[in-house]
From Swiss-Prot:
Chief localization: plastid
A Gene Ontology biological process term: translation
Name the record gives this protein: Large ribosomal subunit protein bL21c
Assembly mode: Part of the 50S ribosomal subunit.
Keyword Plastid found: yes
HAMAP family in the cross-refs: Ribosomal_bL21
Secretion signal, residue range per the UniProt entry: none
Top-level taxonomy: Eukaryota, Viridiplantae, Streptophyta, Embryophyta, Anthocerotophyta
């Protein structure tokens, strides 16, 4: 737990560490056909990096920071059922929604030309 980074992706902020995997929303909006297994990913929206006792904060994002990773697979979250009904109006509507997620693993955190591994 010496090295971690906080990234901004999919409308949320994630705390990522090298060697761990995470689920991301809206990651498959790029093109679902290119997100096969072991597709390499670079994430440039890095908000903060903590390495040993050093902390690097960015004004919005860090300039020379990238997160290198690869997509393991894409999958759907559990289905949510939405049921709307108005009493005495005979109005009923049933909707379903499944969130599309991409599971990716962080290989390394790069900052100023240095790569930090687990």
């Amino acid at each position: 737990m010496n090295t971690y980074a906080i990234i901004d992706t999919g409308g949320e902020q994630l705390r990522v560490e090298p060697g761990r995997f995470y689920d991301m929303r809206h990651f498959t909006l790029l093109n679902p056909s290119i997100l096969d297994s072991n597709t390499k990913v670079l994430i440039y929206r890095v908000l903060m990096i903590h390495h040993e006792s050093n902390i690097a904060l960015g004004d919005s994002w860090l300039e020379d920071a990238t997160i290198k990773g690869r997509v393991l697979h894409s999958h759907f979250k559990d289905k949510i059922t939405i049921y709307k009904m108005r009493s005495k109006k005979k109005m009923r509507r049933k909707l379903g929604y499944r969130l599309n997620l991409a599971r990716f693993v962080v290989d390394s955190i790069c900052f100023d030309g240095k790569e930090f591994y687990k």
